[in-house]
């Protein structure tokens, strides 16, 4: 079970809603992924009406909505976006995203920390998208974030776990949930990072752009569950030399 801000969720796979060909496919994929938490863009939240098929589909699924502040270029804009989402949905959940660079969409660490501190004081459950920086993640934890969401690779790139060495340090040091966000392109990568000990992953592009998004969502759900089971079971130690699994006895030597 995944616990965030005193709320418990059965799934450790969070999904996004962007890039799907239509709302029906998105709804089927989210259902197949068995996700309890789903992110959505502020433009969906701001509309907040029955005409928005994506928002309608998500409400029918009964998932927890996690509005993001994507598009915000600084802390002030992000705080404003979060307050708008609260007015529209009455929810204090927010995925904090501040990436002024539109080419690589890398998060601004300084503005993210500033916005996180402000939003926590305002009573929001803040889940910040951030670089895989162990020092920054501890600072975000210190200001009261409900979790940290370090990237595996740039958003939408499907490049996989480019930041794996730093993710390991973040997991080792964190006292709050670690959710790897961005860059995961294959179920095997989701499984690998879950084996590492992260608490959850967020996947959007890899599912939405697959030839069969629903089947891919199922694959990711299985991978996340398998990876978590492996972590909890306790992975065997690695060795630089061979270690025989059977006794090396002298039974082939001639007897006297």
UniProtKB/Swiss-Prot annotation:
Organism: Alteromonas mediterranea (strain DSM 17117 / CIP 110805 / LMG 28347 / Deep ecotype)
Catalyses which reaction(s): [ThiS sulfur-carrier protein]-C-terminal-Gly-aminoethanethioate + 2-iminoacetate + 1-deoxy-D-xylulose 5-phosphate = [ThiS sulfur-carrier protein]-C-terminal Gly-Gly + 2-[(2R,5Z)-2-carboxy-4-methylthiazol-5(2H)-ylidene]ethyl phosphate + 2 H2O + H(+)
Highest taxon of source: Bacteria
Job of this protein: Catalyzes the rearrangement of 1-deoxy-D-xylulose 5-phosphate (DXP) to produce the thiazole phosphate moiety of thiamine. Sulfur is provided by the thiocarboxylate moiety of the carrier protein ThiS. In vitro, sulfur can be provided by H(2)S.
Family: Belongs to the ThiG family.
Protein name (database record): Thiazole synthase
EC numbers, comma separated: 2.8.1.10
Chief subcellular location: cytoplasm
GO CC annotations on file: cytoplasm
Pathway: Cofactor biosynthesis; thiamine diphosphate biosynthesis
């Amino acid at each position: 079970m995944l616990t965030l801000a005193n709320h418990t969720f059965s799934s450790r796979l969070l999904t996004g809603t962007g890039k799907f060909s239509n709302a029906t496919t998105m709804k089927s994929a989210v259902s197949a992924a068995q996700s309890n938490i789903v992110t959505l863009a502020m433009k969906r939240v701001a509309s907040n009406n029955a005409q928005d098929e994506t928002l309608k589909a998500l409400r029918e699924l009964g998932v927890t909505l996690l509005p993001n502040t994507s598009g915000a270029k600084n802390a002030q804009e992000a705080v404003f976006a979060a307050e708008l989402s609260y007015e529209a949905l009455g929810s204090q959940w927010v995925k904090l995203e501040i990436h002024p660079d539109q080419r690589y969409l890398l998060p601004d660490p300084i503005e993210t920390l500033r916005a996180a501190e402000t939003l926590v004081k305002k009573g929001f459950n803040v889940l910040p998208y951030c670089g895989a920086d162990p020092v920054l993640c501890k600072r975000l934890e210190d200001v009261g974030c409900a979790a940290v969401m370090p990237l595996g690779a740039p958003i939408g790139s499907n490049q996989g776990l480019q930041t794996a060495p730093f993710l390991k340090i973040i997991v080792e040091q964190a006292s709050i949930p670690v959710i790897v966000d961005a860059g995961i392109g294959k179920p095997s990568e989701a499984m690998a990072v879950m084996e590492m000990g992260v608490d959850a992953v967020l996947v959007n592009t890899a599912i939405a752009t697959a030839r069969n998004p629903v089947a891919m969502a199922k694959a990711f759900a299985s991978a996340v569950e398998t990876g978590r089971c492996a972590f909890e079971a306790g992975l065997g130690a690695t060795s630089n030399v061979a270690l025989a699994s059977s006794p090396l006895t002298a039974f082939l030597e001639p007897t006297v």
